Amino acid sequence: MSSGAETRGRKKSWLGKVVSDSMDKGIVVAVERRVQHPVYKKYFKKTTRLMAHDENNEAGVGDLVRITECRPLSKNKSCRLVEIVEKAK
């Protein structure tokens, strides 16, 4: 029997903007994606808000960040901050 680590896929990662950093060691990231309407075929934006773990409280509101999925860290938090791509001005 093969080990479970070989059969698992890659973890998802998202690029988004920090919309809240008021939690201790936590941030809320808004991730935008383009979705096509099933009937009218027009593209529009949908926003998903994900809570992520920020161990050092280094991300601020307006920063562009990369987050990745991980094991559940709390009721709503199952992502980690990987890097800050661009700091807010």
Swiss-Prot record:
Keywords: Ribonucleoprotein, Ribosomal protein, RNA-binding, rRNA-binding. GO terms for biological process: translation. GO terms for cellular component: cytosolic small ribosomal subunit. One of the primary rRNA binding proteins, it binds specifically to the 5'-end of 16S ribosomal RNA. NCBIfam families: PRK05610.1, uS17_bact. Belongs to the universal ribosomal protein uS17 family. HAMAP family: Ribosomal_uS17_B. PANTHER family: 40S RIBOSOMAL PROTEIN S11 FAMILY MEMBER, SMALL RIBOSOMAL SUBUNIT PROTEIN US17M. This is Small ribosomal subunit protein uS17. The gene is rpsQ.
